[in-house]
Curated annotation (Swiss-Prot):
The modification Phosphoserine is found at S99, S103, S106, S108. One of its GO terms (molecular function) is superoxide dismutase activity. The modification N6-succinyllysine is found at K4, K10, K92, K123, K137. It comes from Hylobates lar. GO terms for cellular component: cytoplasm; cytoplasmic vesicle; cytosol; dendrite cytoplasm; mitochondrion; neuronal cell body; nucleus; protein-containing complex. It comes from the Eukaryota. Destroys radicals which are normally produced within the cells and which are toxic to biological systems. Disulfide bonds join C58-C147. PANTHER family: SUPEROXIDE DISMUTASE CU-ZN -RELATED (PTHR10003). The lineage of its organism: Eukaryota, Metazoa, Chordata, Craniata, Vertebrata. Its cofactor is Cu cation; Zn(2+). CDD domains: Cu-Zn_Superoxide_Dismutase. Its EC number is 1.15.1.1. Zn(2+) binds at H64, H72, H81, D84. This is Superoxide dismutase [Cu-Zn].
C-alpha cells in the first residue's frame, strides 16, 4: 500500500518550504519532492535528523538519523547515515526544487522517518569526504536554516 508523508520547513531565517514523501511499497524507494525558498544560491545539506523535537528550534532535533551507527556519507554511498539525503541546489532566486529518490529511508519499519525532523543546512554537505572528523558526522554542512517534523499525509 502506498504511504505518503509531508514536512513543512520553517526556521528563524526566511527559509521555508514544503517537502513531500511517497513510497509505493514498504521496502521500495521513497520519492522526496517539493520546493524550498529563501536560500542563498548553491548547495545546502539536506538530512533527516533523529528526533521530531523542535522545542528549541532545529537544534533539538539531534544528530542525523543513524540507526546503523555508520559514518556520514552521500546518498549513493554504502557507508552513510539513513538520514543522509545529500544536498539540494538553490538557484539565483534562492529556490531549490527538490526531486530525490532514495532507497535507504522508509515511511515504515525500522528505518521509518515519520516523526523525525527534516533539516536544510546553511552550507554544502561534503558527503563525508572533507578529510576531518566533523565531515564524518555532519558533512560540514553548517547551521540549521529550517526544519520540520515529517508527518503522515493522505
Amino acid at each position: 500500500m502506498a504511504m505518503k508523508a509531508v514536512c513543512v520547513l520553517k526556521g528563524d531565517s526566511p527559509v521555508q518550504g514544503i517537502i513531500n514523501f511517497e513510497q509505493k511499497e514498504s521496502n521500495g524507494p521513497v520519492k522526496v519532492y517539493g520546493r524550498i525558498t529563501g536560500l542563498t544560491e548553491g548547495l545546502h545539506g539536506f538530512h533527516v535528523h533523529q528526533f521530531g523535537d523542535n522545542t528549541q528550534g532545529c537544534t533539538s532535533a539531534g544528530p542525523h538519523f543513524n540507526p546503523l551507527s555508520r559514518k556520514h556519507g552521500g546518498p549513493k554511498d554504502e557507508e552513510r547515515h539513513v538520514g543522509d539525503l545529500g544536498n539540494v541546489t538553490a538557484d539565483k532566486d534562492g529556490v531549490a526544487k527538490v526531486s530525490i529518490e532514495d532507497s535507504v529511508i522508509s515511511l515504515s519499519g525500522d528505518h521509518s522517518i515519520i516523526g523525525r525532523t527534516l533539516v536544510v543546512h546553511e552550507k554544502a554537505d561534503d558527503l563525508g569526504k572533507g578529510g576531518n572528523e566533523e565531515s564524518t558526522k555532519t558533512g560540514n554542512a553548517g547551521s540549521r536554516l529550517a526544519c520540520g517534523v515529517i508527518g503522515i499525509a493522505q
